[in-house]
């Protein structure tokens, strides 16, 4: 086992604070509308230019073991805030640095670290209650657009794209962000349910120009096994042929003989049909087929449910107003399923999301939820260079997460104003002793740090601005983008309550733990062994 170095009390805390300051100073330059960019070196390819706090934090690894411990702990604040709220990482880092700096001064002065932490925890709980009281719901498109704009570094086009996407697919719909192929940002909306399986044969295509199959008001058969014998399908095919309508078959697979028969009948015009493979794999495939059955009003034909394909008839088929199939995707629009059954299915998926253990499972369940509840929107980010594309995509991702957080828990005045207004909730709050009171006072002062940093990044005098904001009430604050004061909500400067709350809670939690640290243990870096002497080159025969 490698030898360890142990640092105690003030020496340990000083090293830890140095690491925190290194990370926080790199992250906090990005805060606010006039925050600067940070350039990140990559082991391959061009450097990345970003204004995203968590991206900067994730890149930082310090040479000194003990300083690095401090930096990694605060990195956790940024990552946790990003995971929970999707934004507010820089605010959380600035709060943690401010709390820790003042907290360690108090510990050095002889105060009890545990009582300081209890005071901070007590004040945090009161501030969270006050933030919730200050919060206003965010449901109208204008507020959604404003939140998206602020989170995307005051880019109004991004705010509008997100508001449009939410208007089209609903607030719980799936919105994804992709790299576009042009210079302009685009919004693509896929209505209805789409899954990533196309037709099993190009001979099913009805439109030869763009190789798509368009089925109007088709019947839909959903089977979870391979179809190998065409005889099993004969009762269905005869019924569909008599009705004069089309048929979409969704099955695990259709084997060559049965597929050839379907293609021939389709080309001769006996029955208009298209077969596609079922989406997903294993248990997820069955769940997705049940979703499609619910959406279209079909009966899910599965031997697990004691149903055989040869026993099916026209009553087991679902319908939709339109189906479009390409070589890669199938889109079912306006399925004829009962609204009650769809709502019940949606509630089951929501319950599964709440119980999901892994991010992957949760993501797949959310995709299923969106497909059942209204569609998928894709924001395609446009840019001139690849570096700009990556930077912009990060900003759009942040803005999307922040907007979702705003819809979930509401909004408060932005620009650090909500935390300043929440200060009044601490007026009558006292701890059990002087050290706890000092912990409360620490947090009261620390929550001014985000506003101070926004002003500092804009080139202003932070103390003057903070005093001016404190002297007024309500949503009155400082707009760093154009150096003016006014109502932050009217100016469209909003923060999601969830983002501000998460930043505060995570910063207070980590700062409390670091203040109460008394020892640090790290491996001693061993000197690398000296390189061996290189062997001499042997003489070559025939050389003079």
Curated annotation (Swiss-Prot):
Primary site of residence: cytoplasm
Annotated Pfam families: Cpn60_TCP1
GO annotation (BP), single: protein refolding
Gene Ontology terms: cellular component: cytoplasm
Regions that span the bilayer: none
Keyword Magnesium: no
Isomerase found in the keyword field: yes
Residues binding ATP, per UniProt: 30-33, 51, 87-91, 415, 479-481, 495
One GO MF term: ATP-dependent protein folding chaperone
Gene3D superfamilies referenced in this protein's UniProt entry, alphabetically: GroEL (3.50.7.10), GroEL-like equatorial domain (1.10.560.10), TCP-1-like chaperonin intermediate domain (3.30.260.10)
InterPro entries with a match to the protein in the record: Chaperonin_Cpn60_CS, Cpn60/GroEL, Cpn60/GroEL/TCP-1, GroEL-like_apical_dom_sf, GROEL-like_equatorial_sf, TCP-1-like_intermed_sf
Keywords tagged on the record: ATP-binding, Chaperone, Cytoplasm, Isomerase, Nucleotide-binding
EC number(s) on file: 5.6.1.7
Annotated family: Belongs to the chaperonin (HSP60) family.
HAMAP family, per the entry: CH60
Name of protein: Chaperonin GroEL
Organism of this sequence: Francisella tularensis subsp. holarctica (strain LVS)
Gene: groEL
